[in-house]
């Protein structure tokens, strides 16, 4: 077989074929289901094959994700095409619609949510949709750039300068206005993700996201 454009030898499959015959795939999957029951395991792992999940013998969960434009393991829910792209990714799981063995679906894998939202915002490239959204919120709070300069003890000459990538001069002051926006950012991710699920797999339970780490604001935003 091939994977990623490269050929490889599947020695476990060769051994199973020799010992079990042409029906080795079905017999191997049956053995996995039986062993899981004997060992007290009640749910298939995230990367289990589609075939073993479609056997309808052991409950499983789904996982869907899209490439985040930032290149970071954090979502970009303010992208205009976020829901559309996620719906396309969910098409791969259309076979599980209304399957009673499907416990639900996770959106995203091993997200690394920073402790502070400002930390993420300043690391994003200039022009990123999340950064643009943050800038809009800040401009709603301050009627003029002079007011912001006074609050941040800064001397910006235009609004585009205040969140520039790599500028660390006023981050401590900026964090007081940016960090409270974390809740709305996370809430938008959960809201739009659920929207995509309801469009593509209506009735499927949204299990949230799989996280490497994350602050408590995620739990509040997910409710």
Feature map (PLM): residue ranges:
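Polysaccharide-binding and catalytic clefts of secreted carbohydrate-active enzymes
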Residues: 1, 10-18, 99-222
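Active-site-adjacent substrate/metal-binding segments within catalytic domains
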Residues: 1-55, 64, 69-101, 171-172, ...
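Active-site-proximal beta-strand/loop segments in catalytic clefts of secreted hydrolases
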Residues: 47-49, 63-67, 107-110, 209-211
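Short loop/helix-cap segments at secondary-structure boundaries that form the rim of catalytic
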Residues: 50-58, 219-223
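Proline-centered loop/turn at the N-terminus of a beta-strand
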Residues: 57-59, 204-205
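Short secondary-structure boundary/capping segments
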Residues: 58-62, 120-123
């Amino acid at each position: 077989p091939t994977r990623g454009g490269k050929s490889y030898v599947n020695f476990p499959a060769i051994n199973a074929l020799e010992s079990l015959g042409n029906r080795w795939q079905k017999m191997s999957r049956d053995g996995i289901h039986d062993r899981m029951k004997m060992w007290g395991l009640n749910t298939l792992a995230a990367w289990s094959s589609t075939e073993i999940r479609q056997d309808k013998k052991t409950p499983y969960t789904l996982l869907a994700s899209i490439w985040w434009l930032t290149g970071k393991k954090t979502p970009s829910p303010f992208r205009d095409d976020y829901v559309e792209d996620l719906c396309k990714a969910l098409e791969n799981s259309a076979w599980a619609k209304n399957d009673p063995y499907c416990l639900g679906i996770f959106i995203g894998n091993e997200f690394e949510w920073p402790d502070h939202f400002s930390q993420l915002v300043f690391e994003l490239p200039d022009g990123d949709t999340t950064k643009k959204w943050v800038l809009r919120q800040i401009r709603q709070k301050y009627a003029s750039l002079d007011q912001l300069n006074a609050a941040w003890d800064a001397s910006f000459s235009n609004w585009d300068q205040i969140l520039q990538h790599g500028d660390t001069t006023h981050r401590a002051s900026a964090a007081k206005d940016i960090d409270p926006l974390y809740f709305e950012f996370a809430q938008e991710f959960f809201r739009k993700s659920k929207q995509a699920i309801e469009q593509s797999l209506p009735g499927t339970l949204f299990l949230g996201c799989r996280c490497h780490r994350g602050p408590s604001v995620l739990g509040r935003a997910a409710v």
